[in-house]
């Protein structure tokens, strides 16, 4: 999913991701330093988001604090997680002969201890490291710095499944809910 095309601006998408996944009650100057966009670009997009009733700007004597409106916050979060999920699926499809299956977890509001579980076949450590780095880059693009990813070989997965391992059974149970 191309969020820039949906929202019409990379700056606007970065502001929304920042407000959803990093912090709220932030000033335009703080956004400028964190997002590395120019102040005029941020000001223009903040005004656009405010006129669209997506954000609120609390103008007090100490400055301006920007927050997402509560009524749109959950919808935006679902949309951005859909975009995140789509990018991960695209990444995994490039390795379709090496990745047997994958499961989305905690950060996708699925009741698992991990955020992402990847079951692989025919992968060596350098390939695993490359995929892990790509996964981290995708999450960082959404301003999600900490992500819990488990890589497990297909042989280990099958062995743990046969032994009724709790971790594997929890994953299978959440898939059926």
Residue ranges and their predicted role:
Residues 116:
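Conserved beta-strand/loop subsegment of P-loop NTPase cores
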Residues 1-100, 106-111, 120-177:
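Catalytic core of pol beta-like nucleotidyltransferases
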């Amino acid at each position: 999913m191309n969020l820039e095309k949906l929202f019409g601006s990379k700056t606007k998408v970065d502001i929304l991701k920042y407000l959803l996944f990093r912090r709220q009650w932030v000033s335009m100057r703080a956004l400028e330093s964190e997002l590395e966009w120019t102040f005029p670009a941020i000001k223009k997009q903040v005004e656009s988001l405010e006129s669209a009733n997506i954000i609120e700007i609390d103008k007090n004597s100490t400055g301006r604090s920007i927050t997402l409106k509560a009524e749109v916050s959950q919808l935006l979060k679902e949309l951005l997680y859909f975009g995140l999920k789509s990018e991960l699926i695209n990444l995994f499809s490039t390795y379709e002969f090496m990745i047997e299956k994958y499961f989305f977890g905690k950060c996708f509001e699925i009741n698992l201890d991990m955020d992402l579980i990847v079951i692989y076949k025919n992968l060596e450590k350098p390939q695993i490291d490359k995929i892990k780095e790509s996964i981290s880059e995708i999450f960082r693009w959404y301003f999600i710095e900490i992500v819990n990813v488990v890589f497990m070989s297909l042989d280990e997965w099958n062995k743990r499944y046969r032994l009724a391992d709790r971790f594997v059974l929890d994953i299978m149970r959440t898939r059926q809910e």
